[in-house]
């Protein structure tokens, strides 16, 4: 996921990724076999796995082929160039909406949006367990109205309440291959890491 930000119509924004964010994320496979605590975002799956020591450098030797079972699923333990990913990956975090004096930023008159940009590629997004949308194209900016998924101040008073954000990268989501071509991997090159990991 890259550059998700919750933005109300008041002009307040809460960066959920990037250098201005203080929010911690967790990444895990759907079967619980692999867990990455505090992955750096924005980034990508392979970079997070490499930084956590779960995989070796995918650019070295045949690592991209011999380690594919980690991110693609256990069926990928072979030398076939093309195989379908079966393993889903889930990013989760919690965040709080700000309060100001006696007026909460969760008042019913405010509208909250989740803005998602540059996400590759098929992912379901949920807040507090409620599905709010699906992302299928890396080149599109998605804006989801999440007001109904966030409890209002009249329900919980003026104390900040934590909210859960879950992004599930599911290989069964139909997509059209709308992503940066150089990051897709080819028969002669692996996926491109999104940042310097030296």
Q: What positions do the PLM features span?
A:
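Predominantly extracellular/luminal regions of secreted and cell-surface proteins
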Residues: 20-58, 62
């Amino acid at each position: 996921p890259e550059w998700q930000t919750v933005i109300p119509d008041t002009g307040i924004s809460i960066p959920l990724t990037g250098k201005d964010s203080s929010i911690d994320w967790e990444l895990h496979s759907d079967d619980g076999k692999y867990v990455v605590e505090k992955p750096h975002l924005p980034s990508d799956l392979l970079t997070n796995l490499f930084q956590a020591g779960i995989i070796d450098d995918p650019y070295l030797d045949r690592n991209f082929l011999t380690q594919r079972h980690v991110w693609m699923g256990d069926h990928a333990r072979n030398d076939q160039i093309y195989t379908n990913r079966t393993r889903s990956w889930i990013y989760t975090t919690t965040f709080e909406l700000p309060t100001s004096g006696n007026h909460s930023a969760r008042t019913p008159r405010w509208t909250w949006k989740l803005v998602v940009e540059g996400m590759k590629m098929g992912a379901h997004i949920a807040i507090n367990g409620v599905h709010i949308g699906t992302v299928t194209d890396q080149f599109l900016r998605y804006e989801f109205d999440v007001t109904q998924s966030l409890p209002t101040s009249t329900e919980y008073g003026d104390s900040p309440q934590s909210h859960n954000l879950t992004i599930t990268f599911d290989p069964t989501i139909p997509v059209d291959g709308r992503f940066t071509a150089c990051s897709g991997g080819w028969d002669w090159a692996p996926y491109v890491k999104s940042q310097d990991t030296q």
